Amino acid sequence: MKFTGSPLLWPSWLPLPAPPPPLPSVTRRRDPRTVGKRAAITDACDVGYGAGTTGGSGGTTTTVSTPAQFTAAATSDEKAVIVVKGAITGATKVKVGSNKSIIGRAGSSLTGVGLYINKQENVIVRNMKISKVLADNGDRIGIQASSKVWVDHCDLSSDKKNNGKDYYDGLLDITHASMAVTVSNTYIHDHYKGSLVGHSDSNSAEDTGKLYVTYANNHWYNVASRNPSVRFGNVHIFNNYAEKLETSGVNTRMGAQLLIESSVFSDTKKAVTFLDSKSTGYAVVNDVDLGGSTNDRPQGTFTKPDYSYTLLGSSKVKAAVVGTAGQTLTF
């Protein structure tokens, strides 16, 4: 029915109603933690020196939940994506073969089980929580004489409160002329020895001109030293947040060339320094908040890597990295 009458008029003897209050202004932000959780088990590395690492993509996919299943899958010669489900506990070092992706489901873990990547290539370790690997079984992740390795969204730790510094070994060591390695979005915490690049002062013949490593968007917390420690290598560190480093932060030695950008140190002794070697290394430091600590190293010559990357800016690093780094992905 079509209404054709006159429009209703507000009576002149009534006061006009007050206008409604304005709607609150809402600024919507994209939550980086939500975005960071979107992932696929076939993702390839797209950041840093390890870019292009594809792991087991294109091979078989297998889900493992026991030490025996995990060891068999990781050591095989076949290209494979290995999905870790649940908690796996042991006291061993598992040798990881080439063309593997080791992917942790949310809530999965390796306790007492270290990963050993030696003379291999094209390996991805992603969303893995690894802890309490005894020194006799090596590092949480040990990379030797290998190339194209991507460690992403991992949680690496130990039990620092109850044991001395040599009860466990390092959390993540990259040695023996390894090349094209990226460590990204990883939570490195509660340990004495964080991450070592280059294992010995006497290994210059093998390591010089090698050890190209990128550390991007990592959170370092309550680690005494090696955050990281670098001999001989060329290492790019950007968008990292480090706190409670009781002995030292970044240690550059034996001629290492470091580029440190868009990063923050908090409650740290000797943020960028030189310790425990015959000769110093070098560091170019851009937009780094030392948090009242010091950078006492000479400036080097490494000013730009041969890949593109995005700097968050030191003022934005903490909000972007804390709570996002670590085992935070779902697949």
Curated annotation (Swiss-Prot):
**UniProt-listed Enzyme Commission number(s):** 4.2.2.2
Q: Which family does it belong to?
A: Belongs to the polysaccharide lyase 1 family.
Give one GO molecular function term: pectate lyase activity
Using the record for this protein, list the coiled-coil segments as residue ranges, or answer none. none
Name of the protein described by the UniProt record: Pectate lyase B
User: Any idea which residues are catalytic in this one?
Assistant: 226
Please provide the record's keywords in A-Z order: Calcium, Glycoprotein, Lyase, Metal-binding, Secreted, Signal, Virulence
A single GO cellular-component term on record: extracellular region
Where does the record place it? Secreted
- Signal peptide from the UniProt entry: 1-25
User: What positions does the entry give for Ca(2+) binding?
Assistant: 139, 169, 173
GO biological process annotation, one example: pectin catabolic process
Kindly list the organism's lineage.
Answer: Eukaryota, Fungi, Dikarya, Ascomycota, Pezizomycotina
